UniProtKB/Swiss-Prot annotation:
Residue spans of biased composition, Basic and acidic residues class: 66-85
Family: Belongs to the amino acid/polyamine transporter 2 family.
Cellular compartment(s): Cytoplasmic vesicle membrane
Gene: unc-47
Cytoplasmic-facing ranges: 1-93, 141-167, 225-228, 285-305, 363-398, 443-457
Entry's Gene Ontology BP terms: gamma-aminobutyric acid transport; glycine transport; neurotransmitter loading into synaptic vesicle
Source species of the chain: Caenorhabditis elegans
GO molecular function, one term: glycine transmembrane transporter activity
Keyword rRNA-binding: no
Biased amino acid composition, Polar residues: 29-46
Origin organism lineage: Eukaryota, Metazoa, Ecdysozoa, Nematoda, Chromadorea
Gene Ontology cellular component list: dendrite terminus; neuron projection terminus; synaptic vesicle; synaptic vesicle membrane
Ranges per topology, Lumenal, vesicle: 115-119, 189-203, 250-263, 327-341, 420-421, 479-486
Protein name, UniProt field: Vesicular GABA transporter
Length: 486
């Protein structure tokens, strides 16, 4: 009964909501290649692509059911929301990608983590890096059986563990990506309000979101890559500025200000914030698959996480030792000189604006690959018209997605609490619990007792961090909301 209702709803939406009637061309055109998969110049459009590449989805009115092999190919086409590279990448390039993911915008909040958690926060920065490195290794091991690659994505690993479990992984990935977009809005608004307090935070969020509506039209990974490149440049500039500024006050530092005192109410939020900053597992399978020499993956991942841990510890300590009790949620807001603060904050705002398109694009691709490739492969019709342009309703849905991130940001405009809550939910699942759980299930027959205990230990630790973190982070968020209302 429920399946019939879903089928009726699906048919109705395909006919009336995601309708081809918006197109003015002849809808009887068959075998039109999709927007994302045009053949290269000189290639024959009749030759099918290899089975492990994303296949064109044909716009067709033919009503016959697809063959089982075709459905399997469509399943293989779905990835983690990140497009494949046009050519294999080196270990150094892979390390750069991982470093960008875990050394991102949110390091500006590390000094406040040291202020709140002291040496416990510093220990978390090192410990979480260690665990995330090992769970990344475990996740990649789940792709192989007897040295042969059997699976390609995080979702395929989850579905092998339990059919249908991959949907939970996709939901966590989507939550992680959209949460990242939301936090960029909160961060940009915080920085702008500190520079120009005549406009409140909500106003700056709306202004920032208006400029980000153009992301709704992004459909070229090359453009997203260029934006990410400029984002990396701005990241290096602002980090260099802040490190040099902090080093100029080295004579005033006092390491005794970093305490061992433990506040059980705030520490789980800080740990979640640290976990959120190390989450890169959603694209590790794709990254490993695109390396020229996948055997170098473990070494690459190890040194990437070592570098990240060292930099995060140093940056967090430098910021707190320089500003002490005056340390703000964003380190640049701690700067005493207003003109200098405006300069640094504006660079950070540009970085936030350049950072938003990548997770947004990945979220859009995730939704497209699982909902909008075309019926019957996915529940709804394709986002693209036969002339390879994006349909009007698809653009509208993307605009709604941008507005959704704005709505959530307006509802919970609290940077540290939001990062902590997201890290304790999706971060612990994607980076702690699931990789160890899947590895224990898939490799159980080949693991020795120590390796089994190691996986079980990570699962127990991840569950403990998740449960306690969600509770205390939620309490911290509620306190922040109540404090703002009073």
């Amino acid at each position: 009964m429920a399946s019939n209702r879903f089928q009726n709803l699906q048919n109705w939406t395909n006919k009336h909501v995601f309708s081809n009637s918006l197109d003015y061309w002849n809808q009887e055109l068959n075998e039109v290649p999709s927007y994302q998969n045009q053949p290269q110049t000189g290639e024959s459009g009749s030759n099918p692509p290899p089975h492990d590449r994303l296949e064109p989805i044909q716009e067709s009115v033919v009503s016959e059911q697809p063959q089982k092999d075709d459905i399997n190919k469509q399943e293989e086409a779905k990835d983690d929301g990140h497009g494949e590279a046009s050519e294999p990448i080196s270990a150094l390039q892979a390390a750069w990608n991982v470093t960008n993911a875990i050394q991102g915008m949110f390091i500006v909040g590390l000094p406040i983590a040291v202020k709140v958690g002291g040496w416990w926060s510093i220990g978390a920065m090192v410990g979480v890096a260690y665990v995330c490195y090992w769970t990344g290794v475990l996740l990649i091991e789940c792709l192989y059986e007897n040295g042969v690659k059997k699976r390609k994505t995080y979702r395929e690993i989850a579905d092998f563990y339990k059919p249908g479990f991959g949907k939970w992984v996709l939901a966590a990935q989507l939550t992680e990506l959209l949460s990242t977009c939301i936090i960029y809005l909160v961060l940009a608004a915080d920085l702008l309000q500190s520079c120009f307090p005549s406009v409140d935070k909500a106003g700056w969020m709306m202004i920032t979101s208006a400029s980000l509506l153009t992301c709704s039209f992004l459909d070229d990974l090359q453009i997203v890559s260029r934006l990410s490149f400029f984002n990396a440049i701005s990241h290096l500039i602002v980090n260099l500025i802040m490190v040099l500024y902090c080093l100029s006050f080295v004579s005033q530092w006092s390491f005794s200000t970093i305490t061992f005192s433990l506040n059980i109410n705030t520490l789980p939020t800080i740990v979640g914030m640290v976990v959120f900053g190390y989450t890169s597992h959603i694209f590790l399978p794709n990254l490993e698959g695109n390396m020229k020499n996948p055997a170098q993956f473990n070494v690459m991942l190890k040194w990437s996480h070592i570098a990240a841990a060292v930099f995060k510890v140093v940056f967090g300590m430098l910021g707190f030792l320089t500003f002490g009790e005056l340390t703000q949620e964003e380190i640049s807001n701690s700067l005493p000189n207003q003109s200098f603060k405006i300069l640094v904050n504006l660079i950070l705002v540009v970085k936030a604006l350049l950072s938003y398109p990548l997770p947004f694009y990945a979220a859009v691709q995730l939704l497209k690959n699982n909902l909008f490739l075309g019926y019957p492969q996915t529940p709804f019709t394709s986002c693209y018209s036969p002339d390879k342009s994006l349909r009007e309703w698809a653009v509208t849905l993307r605009i709604i997605l941008v507005l959704f991130t704005l709505f959530v940001a307006l509802s919970v405009p609290y940077l540290v609490e939001l990062m902590g809550l997201v890290g304790n939910i999706t971060g612990t699942m994607l980076s702690f619990i699931w990789p160890a759980l899947f590895h224990l299930y898939i490799k159980e027959k080949t693991l020795n007792n120590f390796e089994k205990r190691f996986d079980q230990g990570i699962i127990i630790m991840g569950c403990s961090v998740c449960i306690s973190g969600v509770y205390f982070s939620s309490m911290e968020l509620l306190r922040a909301i109540n404090s703002a209302d009073s």
